[in-house]
Amino acid sequence: MALIRLGFGRQHFCLLKRRSFLMLKLAALVFAVVLFCEFLIYYLVIFRCDWPEVKTPASDSGQKTLKAMFLADTHLLGEVRGHWLDKLRREWQMERAFQTALRLLQPEVVFILGDIFDEGKWSSSQAWADDVERFQKIFRHPRHVQLKVVAGNHDIGFHYQMNAYKIKRFEKVFSPERLFSWKGINFVMVNSVALEGDGCHICSEAEAELIEISRKLNCSRKQERRSGPCPDPQLLPASAPVLLQHFPLYRRSDANCSGEDAAPLEERGIPFKERYDVLSQEASQQLLWWLRPRLILSGHTHSACEVLHGAEVPEISVPSFSWRNRNNPSFIMGSMTPTEYALAKCYLPYEDTVLATYCVAAGLLVVLILVHSELLPSPFLFGWNLLRKFKT
């Protein structure tokens, strides 16, 4: 009787040991997959990105190079259209991507080209405060890194939705600054939603600001065309500006855009609507005439595109930074001096890569459980038996 009990005890102990070993293997697999998909993959992908080099090295010209990051259309979900799981997944992706980029690339300034929020155009005061708090957590940054934000139509509404309250609410958090100069480089940040051209109060104020900026820029270059006298004791750096805005300048469509992150082929030929998809032709010509930029960066379309205006001014449409808008989000890295610039694109992890990794891991979990339950032969045992049959 004692021997029987001892046998049952050993059998029970072996069963518990096998189960514990299985649970340990399952836990290790789950931990490894989550660690890879939610942390390590961002380092592996962004580590491959590097700052481009300007044609004339800053050390040779005596100019300092500014490292600037440009991203667009983060679209943080609000309380109305934002499902909690969608919020959690997409905001975690952007947080890990942004924090990893800051750590590995160490930019000096980051520009976000509008549509920071998805529901800023209609959110209540409390919802706005909640969205801002989440934004500040996701895009937190060291004090030595500057973060500049341009307003988009989802932040303050389209022209007929925006009002002074929404604009002041936005500028209270992100500053009303329109002209930013650093290391001899001028950046002009335009509220492109206000360039409707219908003479509304907000539009008139925006145009007056741009005319004043144009005067200052012309004075710095000692070209007073349409700018009036130059009494300012402190001139801006004598450098053509970089224009930053949410809406792209006028173009008929994305038909001439190319690349893996351009709009889908079936959408590229769809004509753009002025004042909705792009700025009007009149507003676009005014900006080019007033500011005479050397480079334009914009967002809004969620897809990449490179356009040349007037045969000399390039515009880069920056794709969305969020998985919610694209499977292959990215951002632009710019090495800039007062006279030169070089741009490179840095892709983030593809969403379908992460999902495929989770699916493969789930399949392995099922196989391990079936093998343990003896519902499926061990792969090693199956291979050994197959080899023996082949030999015989």
Curated annotation (Swiss-Prot):
Transmembrane regions listed in the UniProt entry: 25-45, 352-372
Enzyme Commission number, as recorded: 3.1.-.-
InterPro entries membership: Calcineurin-like_PHP_ApaH, Metallo-depent_PP-like, MPP_MPPE1, PGAP5/Cdc1/Ted1
Keyword Metal-binding among record annotations: yes
GO terms of molecular function: GPI-mannose ethanolamine phosphate phosphodiesterase activity; manganese ion binding
Cofactor mode of binding and number, as noted: Binds 2 manganese ions per subunit.
Keywords for the protein's UniProt record, in alphabetical order: ER-Golgi transport, GPI-anchor biosynthesis, Hydrolase, Manganese, Membrane, Metal-binding, Transmembrane, Transmembrane helix, Transport
Annotated SUPFAM superfamilies: Metallo-dependent phosphatases
Subcellular location: Endoplasmic reticulum-Golgi intermediate compartment membrane
Cofactor needs: Mn(2+)
Entries under Pfam families matching the protein: Metallophos (PF00149)
Gene3D superfamilies: 3.60.21.10
Superkingdom of the organism of origin: Eukaryota
Cross-referenced PANTHER family: METALLO PHOSPHOESTERASE RELATED (PTHR13315), METALLOPHOSPHOESTERASE 1 (PTHR13315:SF0)
Family, as annotated: Belongs to the metallophosphoesterase superfamily. MPPE1 family.
Subunit structure: Interacts with GPI-anchor proteins (via the GPI portion). Interacts with TMED10.
Name the UniProt record assigns to this protein: Metallophosphoesterase 1
Source organism (scientific name): Ailuropoda melanoleuca
Gene encoding the protein: MPPE1
